[in-house]
Amino acid sequence: MAEVTVSELAKSVGASVDRILAQMKQAGLSHQTPDDTVSDEEKQTLLSFLKSSHGESAAAPKKITLKRKTTTTLKTGSGSGRKTVNVEVRKKRTYVKRELTAEDATETAADEVLIPEQEQLESTSVAEIPESVSSDTAVEEIVADTVVEAEVEAASPEPEPEVEATPEPEVEDVVAEEAEPAAAEPAPAPVVEQRSSFVDDAEILRQRAAVRKKAEEEAEVARRKADAEKAEAAAKQKAEQAAVQKGSVEKPAAGDKDESKHHKKPKPKSETEEFDEEAKAKHNKKAGKAVKKVAGPKKVASALDYVEDKEEIDEVIHSAPKSKKGGQNNNSSNSGSRPLIKVANRHGFKKPTGKITYKVEIPEEIVVSELAQRMNVKAGEVVKHLFKLGTMVTINQAIDQETAQLVVEEMGHEAVLVSGDAVEQKLREQVVEVDDAELVARAPVVTVMGHVDHGKTSLLDYIRKTRVASGEAGGITQHIGAYRVNTSHGELAFLDTPGHAAFTAMRARGAQCTDVVILVVAADDGVMPQTEEAVQHARAAGVPLVVAVNKIDKEAADPDRVKNELSAKDVIPEDWGGDTQFINVSAQTGEGIEELLEAVALQAELLELSAPVNVPARGVVIESRMDKGRGVVATVLVQGGELKRGDIMLAGQSFGRVRAMVNEYGDNIDSAPPSTPVEILGLDTPPEAGDEFLVVPDERKAREVSEFRAEKERTERMQRQQAAKLENMFAGMGSDEKKILPIVLKTDVRGSLEAIQAALLDVGNDEVQVNFVGGGVGGITENDVNLALTSGAVIVGFNVRADNSARKLAESESAEIRYYSIIYQLIDEVKSALAGMLDPERVEEIVGIAEVRDVFRSPKFGQVAGCMVVEGNVYRNKPIRVLRDNVVIFEGELESLRRFKDDVNEVRNGMECGIGVKNYDVKVGDQIEVFDVKEVAREL
């Protein structure tokens, strides 16, 4: 072998240069610098010193013999005649030590340099063996280690040419067949001298663990050596001194070629294979601690008594030996089965030591069975507690929030009150608030209302015809009831609500979807009943009015008549000092159209309209329908944010993903900014007109809120059965505010209408008053019922009746309709309803007077007055007053009323009694006045 420097030697063995120089100095070598050369003799000297320093003998025996004895148990027979037979197997093997080559010496030196501490630990573990054995036994231990190492190599992914684990029938054959390859193959010399040995199997397992650890260390050294050789090979190609570096690489001697045929050099392993080997070694170590013998499954089970950890059980099962297909592991009769693991006979559940307190969420109404489930108790227990509280219910009945709270607290749990709109609140918390969003100016939303015969449709068609750009697809046909118009004053969004059904529903839900209302009135026809309804709707919504006096091109047009009639409805023109703009227009000639749009733009500019854009879209549903081939089609108006295709939309009880959006011209669009009406596809069911829509984060949340709204709507429908009735009009009214009785009045002639309105307005006083939210001449229509439902009013008909649609709607919504034919009867019933809304008057009535004749002392009540009833009767549990010299000095309650030591409830006039006054001392001569408080209904 060529001479190398100290630095190259340190690099080849994977150790530091300082450590190599220190060990050379201890060995007596004269190397001082990393550039000093090291010959083969100096290497052998260093290797011998390292071996002697770690207690290794220089000379080892050439031939050793190993004896092994294995005892197993075999069960024969079946049923009651089963017998147990002990089988003892004895084995004897002879091994010949191989000669140590130069390459093996270098590897051994590398092992000595890298891991002396680990070898010291191994020496310590082996030193625990008793020393009362001979040197021949130590030789047997070394050979046992060699056998175990051979078995480990046989189990590796790259086995050696011969496998010694194959059993043979005769011991002599085993020795003869294994002696020859042992002589031909060089084996690494043992590092640690074994001083003693055990023949017991447990000691063999310990020795196997030590040899296994040694094998892992050798594999690590081989890997490092291979990495070093790869690094040197890469450096050869780049460095300029290729010849010098090539000479520094150690090559095997020529005499080793023959031996290398039989002994292959270990192949460098990847990081994954090293990780698998480390994991397998850890499993084997843990299994070695728990298992005393690996002869059979029964002995594995005896060593694993009551393993509690599941991971330990899995490790033992994986590490326990499995029988091979060829029957190589036949130490027991059932060697092919899994090892029997004994586990501690305990279940994982532990009985709670204390009472568990739950936080029970209680909504506004909850079923008894569901409440019991939330407290983790039986429903019968909840029914018992409710019975103690005086409530008799079944497990399927619902109880209110207060009762459920009392039951939960009485049963020792914590009640958490949940609002009925908790789901809605959580949804709104996930959406960015409008106050925190960026606001931008938006176009005003204009609603055109009026009588159908007054030219409303013609006015809308003229505006669209003149404002829609030429060449637009669908510019003639209006696909939806809303569209946008570009004017010189900006964009305007027009909304058409025929029949006012959508507008009424919007106002009922508090959705302010419109900014300005254009009231169309025909100049030749004047104010009609539907015109009055439009005024009432606009006032209820709180939006400004712009009156368009249409048909001024006709000869019979009279704009002043329209102003006079609307002034009677409190719609005062600006010319007369009011705040309502009147514009004369003609839908046929186009006269006044520009002034009308300018007036609307001016009114919108005063409102300073704005909307957020960087928030989830929200708005209101204009109308919806089922279209054949397209499914649910909904017309919506975006009020805030930007609606995009693909958003998850929630509208009332409907939800779905926006699959397509169509504008008023029939074009498909991808997004819609605020104040833009669009048609959308993708909802599961048609939403109600006036429902507010909102874009939610995910479909699961939309489904949850939709189901909650459906359940809430069913509950509210049941609660509305008592609404809008004269007998219940005073319910929910505040005591300090003026109470209003809303009425929708319909009569047969206008004279009767004016007379009844004047008479009912005079009935009220400072506490109660009649308010006419709607009225007119003619029969009761569906619009009247809708108006009454949204305002909580009572419908009164004088010599008129409701049509079929209005009657069906009133029956379904439990709205009350009253018919009268005599005006005095109508006024008397309304007066009675107003009187019922008045607060009752409290009147005191003196029921008896008792005079104190003497005062006694009672240990239970304190002072007791001996009295004589001089007027009326004295009653127990009624309020009293104590009068001294005809002056009231105390007001309280009677604590006791007795006659001859007996408790009585009443003492008549002229009889004596004992009266105990609570928290007051009376004197002789005082008068005790007993009174009663009664509530008397007031009248107008």
From Swiss-Prot:
Q: Where is the composition biased (Basic and acidic residues)?
A: 213-239
Region (Disordered), start-end ranges: 116-137, 151-196, 210-294, 318-346
**Disulfide bond entries:** none
Q: From which source organism is this entry?
A: Teredinibacter turnerae (strain ATCC 39867 / T7901)
Instruction: Tell me the function of this protein.
Output: One of the essential components for the initiation of protein synthesis. Protects formylmethionyl-tRNA from spontaneous hydrolysis and promotes its binding to the 30S ribosomal subunits. Also involved in the hydrolysis of GTP during the formation of the 70S ribosomal complex.
Segment G1: which positions?
Answer: 450-457
Indicate, by first and last residue, each region the UniProt record lists as having compositional bias (Basic residues): 282-294
Listed GO CC annotations: cytosol
> What is the official name of this protein in its record?
Translation initiation factor IF-2
**Residues engaged in binding GTP:** 450-457, 496-500, 550-553
Query: Region G2: start and end of each range?
Result: 475-479
